């Protein structure tokens, strides 16, 4: 009997590996039935990661978006799944236990079936509590192993990690190859070893295409017993994203696996809709570099999705580094030469920093350390003279246990700064906070929402939620979009033009509102720069009680 391989469309990750934002609620409602009509997907990634935070950033309610997107899939039996950062849940920094626990209740009520729980350090202590809470809420707990390639991250390392996660209740295992640098045969060996002991455990493989291994990896893990493969579709497949379902389906079908057929008419319709969403507004935040693969990532191991921000950082430092080199009488570097030096420095400092998996946020920490070392070198300073303050939590153990060991100079540097290392459970450092947010919502008269979903968003993304409630997020997003459209020479739609606000006849309020209105109008002129209006009166007619 042929082995069946299922496909999951990682619709959320397609967008967030390409750019910043995800489609709006109304766009998700349009694409969902077409994805269903394609007939080849048993699962769809609907939310999680940064998707809900960016909903708030463009001034819309993420809870409504999740419910809207999951509902059609729930009705036809396609399983929905979300990305969950373990200790960090849906943000970049640690989250209190009570907020994490509430997340699973809220997401299950919103129609999410499976949570993919990962920790960038692969520390089981950050994953195991989520397994318990997810199952209690009625979700399927998919424990995740972040894949990378290093002397620390061996087949034995991953098999032992899977055993621990399964022993603590994991119902599924995901191999999250976020940089796509897992070697195909190694991945096959990991899957085969897990299946040899746990035949009924579902294994899902997630591999980005950046350095070019992922198609071969998918064939290897399928042969070894994997059950589900994450795929993308045009116009956002390949590049730094994921292989296209058409290619993977054809490859596996020829190899003798049982795979569902693709309704190509629906595929083309979904393709056209996604392109329409890009043209509407999402494309203004998509970095074109993310549409190209590069083998330069094989050595440094950085995830391709961060190439856009990496190149922006590199460009920002390029002139300063060359100015320092010229001042010291040394040869200046081209941008390409500096890029190669950066990748080499990443390879050098990565093991010195404990070999964390290069995934959010730890990939940023390692990249920042390497870039600052290049700057320090251009100044004639020692390596690690300048450190990103945010990375000390990782170094000191406050984010979890590092897979490797810290270099002696890093330990000595921490001692010089009178910093203390922490070996306890990271969650213990972050006390419960829900009572604080409940009290404030009551004081402000804010509704906690269906199934406490508004309470959850407030506690998870406090700053962004306040700006969403005040209307500031929508205003800032529209200003940013108008500026990007203006730079691209695109006409500004009437819907983005600021409306004359309706306010009281208070003279100060009227003056501030009119000044803001006129400034926004003027921003549409080719050479205009939007002025910042500062007044205490603004707070009076734009309160948080919305």
Question: What residue ranges belong to the model's regions?
Answer:
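Conserved, mostly hydrophobic/aromatic
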Residues: 14, 117, 173, 225, ...
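Terminal or standalone catalytic/regulatory effector modules within metabolic enzymes
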Residues: 36-54, 289-527, 538
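Surface-exposed amphipathic alpha-helices with a cationic face
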Residues: 66-74, 128-138, 188-199, 249, ...
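N-terminal amphipathic alpha-helix/helix-capping segment at the start of soluble metabolic enzymes
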Residues: 1-18, 66-71
